[in-house]
From Swiss-Prot:
It is a single-pass type I membrane protein. This is Izumo sperm-egg fusion protein 3. Residues 1-20 form the signal peptide. Belongs to the Izumo family. PANTHER family: IZUMO SPERM-EGG FUSION PROTEIN 3 (PTHR36470:SF1). Izumo is the name of a Japanese shrine to marriage.
Length: 239
């Protein structure tokens, strides 16, 4: 009953969740789950959890590869089918071997996953180099967008499918960068002007204080002179 619940849930999760090249066909995920289920005897403890974990790792591997680089997004449907067939054959080979325990099984399945990752990366990279080149070679059959699971009839690609940036996004980034530079220039200019204003104001205040001091000293000298003259006159009158 646990296996049945797991296999019924897989197509639903594949439909609603993120995609990779291999899981665009929900039937393929069911087949993988069924093949993996045949590899593990029913008496193995925690069999359902083990199956669920292995299937999730397999699905995540396909997603991880196709989303690791913007250029690893499109692939010929024919190549996807061949890759799925290869993976099923690997599972059939494991199924024909004698069961030697969970750890041996996980080790062999890890080898299959590593080979699958390597093959998928190589196929996506080679196809991208051809489909995104200026003199791209015509590819027969439909092309699969591994991110959306849409089939396309395009033979050559450019823009986001080849890792090139969206012109609008690039333009918006340039505008944002210009505004940032402009704001930085305004702030720096204002700081320089404020600095010069403070220096000029400080010098001006020093000059004013100096002039005021000289003026006060001069007036004091004049006042002291007048006082001395007055005292001298008073002294003479007393005589």
């Amino acid at each position: 009953m646990g296996d049945l619940w797991l296999f019924l849930l897989l197509p639903l999760s594949a439909f609603h969740g993120v995609k990779g090249c291999l899981e665009c066909d929900p039937k393929f995920i069911e087949d993988v789950g069924s093949l993996l289920g045949n590899l593990i005897p029913s008496e193995v403890p925690g069999r359902t959890q083990l199956l669920e974990r292995q299937i999730k790792e397999m699905i995540h591997l396909s997603f991880k590869v196709s989303h690791s680089d913007k250029r690893l997004r499109v692939l010929a449907v024919q190549q996807v089918v061949k890759l799925r067939t290869w993976l099923k054959n690997e599972f059939y080979k494991l199924g024909n071997e004698t069961w030697k325990g969970v750890f041996i099984y996980q080790g062999k399945l890890l080898d299959v996953c590593q080979n699958l990752e390597s093959k998928l990366k190589e196929l996506l990279k080679n196809f991208s180099e051809i489909a995104c080149s200026e003199d791209c070679i015509v590819v027969e059959g439909p092309i699969l967008d591994c991110w959306t699971c849409l089939r396309m009839t395009n033979r050559c690609f450019k823009g986001e499918y080849c890792g090139d940036e969206d012109p609008r996004k690039a333009e918006n980034r340039e505008i944002a960068l210009f505004l940032i530079l402009l704001a930085t220039a305004v702030i720096l200019g204002s700081a320089v002007l404020l600095f010069h204003f403070c220096i000029f104001h400080r010098r001006k205040m020093k000059a004013i204080r100096r002039s005021l001091k000289e003026y006060v000293e001069k007036k004091l000298e004049e006042l002291m002179g007048k006082i001395d003259e007055k005292e001298e006159k008073d002294f003479r009158l007393r005589k």
